[in-house]
Amino acid sequence: MKSKNSRLDAIKIIISSKEVGSQEELLQELAKEGFRLTQATLSRDLKQLKVAKAASMNGNYVYVLPNNTMYKRMTEQHSASEMLMHNGFISIEFSANLAVIKTRPGYASSLAYDIDNRNFDEILGTIAGDDTIMLVIREGCTRAGVKNALSLIIPNIQ
């Protein structure tokens, strides 16, 4: 049985990556990911996540996460299970001794927490927002070295 937290994460991922207009559709998407739950449980989860409905660009009403009514949907389709395995990681870019990691909304602070708690020699510290992390990289460390260290937390970083 999958945990409530992973179910809530899956709901967030599905809502932010697909246009879902009904609880029935959402239950079907969750079933594809291996989650079995009742409509009543889903309703409570949606309330806890403060999910609302808003008009999409094509005029249909779809579920949206709070503060993300005009949320940019991903063009590449990934399953919620794939996204959960990757800590919401999207990309990393480097500039001098800084790196910027882009994540799915809501994932940056937990990923930064994991990075900070690993005490990587290559990374002095992080600053995280909702979907962006800035890494301060120790002088003399290579980009490959940073990516290699981060691969312990983010398997799909390479």
Curated annotation (Swiss-Prot):
UniProt KW keywords: Amino-acid biosynthesis, Arginine biosynthesis, Cytoplasm, DNA-binding, Repressor, Transcription, Transcription regulation
What InterPro entries does the record tag this protein with?
Answer: Arg_repress (IPR001669), Arg_repress_C (IPR020899), Arg_repress_C_sf (IPR036251), Arg_repress_DNA-bd (IPR020900), WH-like_DNA-bd_sf (IPR036388), WH_DNA-bd_sf (IPR036390)
Listed under GO biological process in this entry are: L-arginine biosynthetic process; protein complex oligomerization; regulation of arginine biosynthetic process
**GO MF:** arginine binding; DNA binding; DNA-binding transcription factor activity
Where does it reside? Cytoplasm
Gene Ontology CC annotation, any one = cytoplasm
Principal cellular location given in the protein's record = cytoplasm
Query: Could you tell me which Pfam families the record lists for this protein?
Result: Arg_repressor (PF01316), Arg_repressor_C (PF02863)
Pathway(s) served = Amino-acid biosynthesis; L-arginine biosynthesis [regulation]
What is known about what this protein does?
A: Regulates arginine biosynthesis genes.
Which family is it part of?
A: Belongs to the ArgR family.
Q: What is this protein called?
A: Arginine repressor
Organism this protein belongs to:
Phocaeicola vulgatus (strain ATCC 8482 / DSM 1447 / JCM 5826 / CCUG 4940 / NBRC 14291 / NCTC 11154) (Bacteroides vulgatus)
Lineage, highest ranks first: Bacteria, Pseudomonadati, Bacteroidota, Bacteroidia, Bacteroidales
